[in-house]
């Protein structure tokens, strides 16, 4: 309910403001119409005065020309006809206006019924009756007096303003006003055209009047006896004309002209002020709208610049991130390459160090006095085999090879042993056979025992003597077995314990040992199946 009452109050205020504006506009239009009507009346009065002056002059000169009364009667009838036509046109215009207003009233009532069905014809019958009464009074007042018609028209305009408060659309009123203005302009043009015709008639009449006057003057000049009469008539005519001018000009035209000028000047000044005010307001509104548009354009330009800056910053950030990522990727690759190269160099260095250690350990591992005795034979094949077996055993212990790979290692050692034995046999076969010493046992049993140990996989167990011990070779066998045990039991990083030096060997026995090794090689050649 409150919202409805508030909306109705706003509507009432809007309608009141609209009514006030329309009333002001209608007042201005009515004042303009009144000014035009007064101007027309003033022109008609001036015409009548001129015609009356012309009639007086024609009556004075009636003794000169008898055709003057006929010519004077024509303008009077023309003026009467013009006045009758103007009154008829005014009445027709008022009738048309009344019909249009009644139509608008009916349309307004229908619209109001559509918006508010509670309104009945009886509630609005009073304004319609009042309008009808006012229209009737207007018609009678226009017929009787023009002043009363003005008041009647004001009342009609007031009723129209009251009725237009119920209207929602003023487009039809604007069209009607435009039509009325066009009709008034056409009527004014017609009046102007009539005035032009009247002016032409007057000019022709003046010309016709001048011609007989000139003829009269010539006739009087011919007659010398009428000079005094001419002077008296001239003085009488001028005196009479002056009296008529004084009678018409101060009494009628003077006061009316001044009053009309004042009445016409005040509305014109007010209209000019209103026009200036409207122009000023329109200029202010246009300037405000222009400023708002300019401000909006500036704000849009600023927003566009900010968006461009943000986009540029985002692009720069993305480029920096991409460059940083590429740099990190390049650094990572460089570090990986450096790490690989360093590891490779470390591996190569360790391999070189291991090779050097392997080369130095058999020679430098023992001191000078603890080095085992080496029998210098022509070829030294048995010592080489022992050194090779020792090297293979060390490599197996260092690399931590499991027992599952022992068979492959043994097969490799066997193949190497076979290669070495074959090489020894090849070298010995080319030499002549020498008689072997009968007192030395065959040392091939120890080699066979070592081979059988590698084949059986019992290298890590203590060797068992399969052959019968001899007193002469006991020291040699003890030295070999002790060295094998040391190879098997010592740690990879531990120092080599010196092998016991056999006490029964002396430098003088070199030749005997030589014969022993030669006998051993001969036995190997003769009995290849045992190997």
UniProtKB/Swiss-Prot annotation:
Its main location: cytoplasm. GO terms for biological process: actin filament bundle assembly; female pregnancy; muscle contraction. Residues 20-200 are annotated as: Myosin and calmodulin-binding. The keyword Ubl conjugation applies. Residues 54-68, 120-133, 162-172, 459-471 have a biased composition (Polar residues). It comes from the Eukaryota. In non-muscle cells, phosphorylation by CDK1 during mitosis causes caldesmon to dissociate from microfilaments. Phosphorylation reduces caldesmon binding to actin, myosin, and calmodulin as well as its inhibition of actomyosin ATPase activity. Phosphorylation also occurs in both quiescent and dividing smooth muscle cells with similar effects on the interaction with actin and calmodulin and on microfilaments reorganization. CDK1-mediated phosphorylation promotes Schwann cell migration during peripheral nerve regeneration. High-molecular-weight caldesmon (h-caldesmon) is predominantly expressed in smooth muscles, whereas low-molecular-weight caldesmon (l-caldesmon) is widely distributed in non-muscle tissues and cells. Not expressed in skeletal muscle or heart. The modification Phosphoserine is found at residues 123, 249, 382, 395, 462, 491, 497, 527. Residues 21-379, 458-531 are annotated as: Disordered. One of its GO terms (molecular function) is myosin binding. Residues 506-531 are annotated as: Weak actin-binding. InterPro entries: Caldesmon (IPR006017), Caldesmon_LSP (IPR006018). Residues 454-460 are annotated as: Calmodulin-binding. Disulfide bonds: none annotated. Changing residue 491 to A: Decreases phosphorylation-dependent actin binding. The N-terminal part seems to be a myosin/calmodulin-binding domain, and the C-terminal a tropomyosin/actin/calmodulin-binding domain. These two domains are separated by a central helical region in the smooth-muscle form. Actin- and myosin-binding protein implicated in the regulation of actomyosin interactions in smooth muscle and nonmuscle cells (could act as a bridge between myosin and actin filaments). Stimulates actin binding of tropomyosin which increases the stabilization of actin filament structure. In muscle tissues, inhibits the actomyosin ATPase by binding to F-actin. This inhibition is attenuated by calcium-calmodulin and is potentiated by tropomyosin. Interacts with actin, myosin, two molecules of tropomyosin and with calmodulin. This is Non-muscle caldesmon. It comes from Rattus norvegicus (Rat).
């Amino acid at each position: 309910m409150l919202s409805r009452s508030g909306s109705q109050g706003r509507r009432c205020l809007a309608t009141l403001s609209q009514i006030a504006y329309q009333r002001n506009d209608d007042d201005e239009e009515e004042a303009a119409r009144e000014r035009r009507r007064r101007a027309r009346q003033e022109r008609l009065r001036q015409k009548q005065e001129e015609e009356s002056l012309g009639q007086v002059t024609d009556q004075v000169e009636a003794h000169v020309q008898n055709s003057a009364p006929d010519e004077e009667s024509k303008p009077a009838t023309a003026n009467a006809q013009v006045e009758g036509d103007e009154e008829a046109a005014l009445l027709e215009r008022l009738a048309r206006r009344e019909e249009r207003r009644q139509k608008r009233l009916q349309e307004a009532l229908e619209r109001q019924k559509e918006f508010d069905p509670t309104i009945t014809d009886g509630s609005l019958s009073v304004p319609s009756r009042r309008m009808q009464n006012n229209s009737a009074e207007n018609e009678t007042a226009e017929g009787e007096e023009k002043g009363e018609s003005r008041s009647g028209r004001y009342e009609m305009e007031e009723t129209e303003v009251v009725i237009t408060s119920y209207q929602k659309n003023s487009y039809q009123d604007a069209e009607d006003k435009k039509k009325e203005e066009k009709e008034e302009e056409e009527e004014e043009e017609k009046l102007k055209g009539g005035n032009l015709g009247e002016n032409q008639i007057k000019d022709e009449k003046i010309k016709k009047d001048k011609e007989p006057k000139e003829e009269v003057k010539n006739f009087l000049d011919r007659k010398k006896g009428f000079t005094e009469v001419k002077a008296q008539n001239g003085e009488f005519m001028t005196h009479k004309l002056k009296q008529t001018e004084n009678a018409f000009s101060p009494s009628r035209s003077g006061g009316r002209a001044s009053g009309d000028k004042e009445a016409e000047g005040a509305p014109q000044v007010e209209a000019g002020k209103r026009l200036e005010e409207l122009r000023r307001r329109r200029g202010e509104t246009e300037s405000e709208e222009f400023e708002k548009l300019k401000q909006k354009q500036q704000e849009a330009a600023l927003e566009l610049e900010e968006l461009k800056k943000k986009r540029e910053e985002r692009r720069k950030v993305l480029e920096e991130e991409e460059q940083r990522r590429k740099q990190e990727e390049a650094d990572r690759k460089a570090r990986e390459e450096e790490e690989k190269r360093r590891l490779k160099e470390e591996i190569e260095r360790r391999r070189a160090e291991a090779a050097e250690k392997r080369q130095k350990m058999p020679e430098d591992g023992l001191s000078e006095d603890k080095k085992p005795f080496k029998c210098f034979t022509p070829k030294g094949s048995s010592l080489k085999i022992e050194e090779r077996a020792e090297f293979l055993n060390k490599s197996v212990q260092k690399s931590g090879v499991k027992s599952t790979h022992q068979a492959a290692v043994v097969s490799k050692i066997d193949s190497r042993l076979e290669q070495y034995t074959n090489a020894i046999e090849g070298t010995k076969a080319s030499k002549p056979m020498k008689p072997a010493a009968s007192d030395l046992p065959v040392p091939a049993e120890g080699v066979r025992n070592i081979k059988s140990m590698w084949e059986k996989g019992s290298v890590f167990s203590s060797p068992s003597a399969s052959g019968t011990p001899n007193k002469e070779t006991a020291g040699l066998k003890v030295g070999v077995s002790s060295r094998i045990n040391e190879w098997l039991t010592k740690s990879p990083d531990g120092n080599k314990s010196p092998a016991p030096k056999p006490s029964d060997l002396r430098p003088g026995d070199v030749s005997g040992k030589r014969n022993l090794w030669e006998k051993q090689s001969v036995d190997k050649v003769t009995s290849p199946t045992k190997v």
